[in-house]
Amino acid sequence: MFKYDINIANYDTALWKAIELEAKRQEEHIELIASENYTSPRVMQAQGSILTNKYAEGYSGKRYYGGCVYVDQVETLAIDRAKALFECDYANVQPHSGSQANFAVYTALLKPGDTILGMNLAHGGHLTHGASVNFSGKMYNVISYGVNKNGYIDYEQLNKLATMHKPKMIIGGFSAYSRVVDWDIMRQVADSIKAFLFVDMAHIAGLVAAGVYPNPVPYADVVTTTTHKTLAGPRGGLILAQGGSKEMYKKLDSAVFPGAQGGPLMHVIAGKAIALKEAMEPEFKIYQHQVVKNAKTMVNVFLNRNFNVVSGGTDNHLFLLDLVDKNITGQEADAALSYTNITVNKNIIPNDPQSSFVTSGIRIGTPAITRRGFNETDAYQLANWICDVLENINNEVVLNATKKKVLNICASHPVYS
């Protein structure tokens, strides 16, 4: 028999020390990785609940195990909230990750060897949109579109490639693109060749939920997302669709279970349900608007200090700094900023002369700093500190002074007070 007062700290000191150190790091570092965020204590409570004990293969009302009456209620809540939030009539909340959600979409709608048209990873796409090292690049014939010289998606190129190669599926979505995607144009191109339009909105789901970024659901045949990132929930995935056939929805469900997964993670699905409810609150809309305001504020600082921002700006939560003209690699910038307790990620830029391990750019995102209370004034200060570091990456005086400023602002904006 277990007692609720047993804990990790008194049993596994090595593990608890690592957890405590990570908690300290999160409080004392400024998080600018665009795909990271801070989830709420309610979500963590759900994920740490007794729901982790229950196996529930199948779907609500159609389980392969008994004793699922209450976990059925949990999953139904998550499904209903996802449908309401994203204005769709189909939602699968079981994918363990965004990549697994994408895998399910591919296997439901495509056959191995089919042609897909996705955004080039080097131009802002994602591994699962056809990168050669990923399953999507190994299982399918991949054609890639990219951005033009101004850093915007080249829709003319996309249309030409679609007309030439007749892909079975066109993929929209990104991991490092800072502008609004024209879903309508993508729909028109897909219709012209009778292709599926699949949108991966993992990075922008929170913005979409708040009405800050155009919703791809009315345009796409199917949409996937992660539930962390801008949505600020637990790590996991969703599959969404509107106006599709029962046959397609059945294929999507079957592709998740039993096609790619076994038992769903009911404690994580509960976390998704809480996060989706939180995303319906007025405060969430205010938060998402602030995410974009902070990103735009930071971009303006970099431009004013003669840094090159890919596409010249941002319409969402992220942007890329092109450091070629500064003679700094992304790897060097990442390391220097890390020393000052500012966390970014090195990132390839369009036509990058460096390898993907070194890179010539860094990606910066504002969801996490906004979640802990940063406003435009804070974002303005932070961007200037980053400029100071990047202009003085070997100057310990500047680096140490910046680290002190970072610790002070983190103390005044705690993540979990």
UniProtKB/Swiss-Prot annotation:
Gene3D superfamilies: Aspartate Aminotransferase, domain 1, Type I PLP-dependent aspartate aminotransferase-like (Major domain). It comes from the Bacteria. It is found in: Cytoplasm. Keywords: Amino-acid biosynthesis, Cytoplasm, One-carbon metabolism, Pyridoxal phosphate, Transferase. Transmembrane segments: none annotated. SUPFAM superfamilies: PLP-dependent transferases. Belongs to the SHMT family. This is Serine hydroxymethyltransferase. It comes from Baumannia cicadellinicola subsp. Homalodisca coagulata. The gene is glyA.
